[in-house]
Amino acid sequence: MEFLSENPDVDVSAAWERCWGIQTKIIERVKARYDVKRHPSCDGREYFVSDEHEVHGKMEGSFNSYTGDEVDWLVHSWIGNRQKSILDINATVFLGQMNQVPHLTIIFGTIPRLYFYAEYTPRMDLRTNPDYVSKYYEPVNQDFLEFRANQDWTRFVSHGTYLRSLMSPICVSSHAELNDTNIDYCEDYLEKFIQRWFDWLDEAEELPIERRDQQQKYDYAVRELGYRNATMYILPIRVF
């Protein structure tokens, strides 16, 4: 957040439009594949705005959540102030228990540097399941290393130990100058990243019925703890 304190009044509206649009295409593709319904928790939150905050001004945002038989939790949301540098834009897909394909998380942010996060959230402990690592993470390793080697981008390391523990070996969490070239780079990276995920869904083996309850407990715990420990979780609490 040191970047934000140094540049608190940058208009990031154009970046919001592009990043929200990139995520919208992903969310619409998920909605086209799975039968999901809007969750009551997002009623009245398609667009919201706060009272004036002494530091961040008026915060605004949108919260859109969906659920279905094959998707436990699908969220497309953002919060921030487009005239005061800060944005947190999220697209998250927590799958149901019909298989063990990793969940999907794509985040854009502005601080006001561009922040980018792309992750296949594991469905089990990777330390004790090397076959799962080989199946879902080893094929992504080269792309991850190439992204990390890009001199325009700097690896973003969370101050929170729990959040760092959530990251898989191929999790992209990086920041760069806020410009169209770097947003283009993220968009290009996501084309392959998202298509690979959908290919996994097409090829996935069904998880036996008797293992699904335990998988659901694991998935829910990861989701809840991830949200509660998220760095930006404090922002709406402070403002609202």
Predicted features and spans:
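Polar low-complexity intrinsically disordered regions
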Residues: 1-6, 216, 240
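Extended amphipathic alpha-helical scaffold segments
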Residues: 233-240
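Extended, charge-biased low-complexity segments
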Residues: 70, 74-143
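Short Lys/Arg-enriched alpha/beta "domain-start" segment
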Residues: 2-96
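Alpha-helical structural elements
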Residues: 11, 15, 29, 42-43, ...
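Mixed-charge (acidic/basic) macromolecular-recognition segments
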Residues: 117-231
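Generic secondary-structure transition motif, activating predominantly at the C-termini of alpha-helices
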Residues: 30-38, 67, 79, 99, ...
